[in-house]
Amino acid sequence: MKNITLLLAILILSSCSVRKNNDFDFEKIAKISDSIKIQNITIHNLFKSQILAHKNDEFDSTIIVKNVYLPHRKLWDSCYAQIFGDENATRFNNEQGMVKWNRTLFDKDKIDFIDKTKTITEINIDKLIKSNLEKFSRLVPYQPNAKISLLFTPISGIGFGGCDSQQFALELNNQSINISYTLQKGLPHELNHLVYEKFRNNDVDKNSALSQTIDEGFACYFTYIFFDKNITEYEAVENMSKQDWDWFIKNEKEIFKKTKSYFSDLSGNNPLLRNDRHKLFPEAPKTLNYWLGFRIVSKYVEKYGKNSWKDIYKLTAKEVLEKSDYEQYIDKL
């Protein structure tokens, strides 16, 4: 009889453990701030309410409207509705559509949503965001007026980006996103884009491949600076490995020589920006323009001093390249 009682107790505890491990930790999630604002940057934790709407047996549509749709309505109505076209627009640009897909959001791949949310709660996201935004405000010469939402979505495609500084999103369920790396290392990268955008828009060649290369490379370099160079250069550039970095260094001269002719291209569809499509360097382990931009910016700072990275905000992409003497460096390789 004692053995039977003990077996039943083990089974009950095991059953409870399984249920707990296969559901959201609503108590921890509820403690996360709805939003965090430092100066002109606001980060909305929309995913919090998307989860809490499912806390009770009956789905709470009011939370979705009040805490998910309305706080960043411009993102849903404008950015998502436009990106995914007329067929999907009604999912995002009205309350009814938002409630409908959020109701069934976790019906499929719920374990994946739970695992990613667990990653977020273990990071202590409130502390992380606050400290990052405070440090960012001390470092940069200009504070963007920006809204960024951390969210789940039924159709992923933005990743970490958006339509403008007021319509930015991090899709937590996007399969291409490494949640831990993006939250801990990716935020400074994206924030620097928002700062540089203000100055880059004054460049008549702002849509050139070179401009996009400097933009991405500068964001990577800023990440390196943001973490006081306590991360490696290759980690700052798309979180690549040492092996990836070594491949780029080995092929540095050839990369520059073969991509230089595309610097003025305005199409956005060229081997420098889309090596994945054009296969100019089929063996390249990561994105060419991120790495090349980082190298150009690095050479600029190497020439003008450790704080000279701040100059780049007010320089055109052509000026950064010319002043860096990167081409002269390449010619000597």
Positions of predicted regions on the chain:
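Non-catalytic architectural context of zinc metalloproteases
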Residues: R19-D126
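C-terminal motif of bacterial Sec signal peptides marking the signal peptidase cleavage site
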Residues: S14-S15
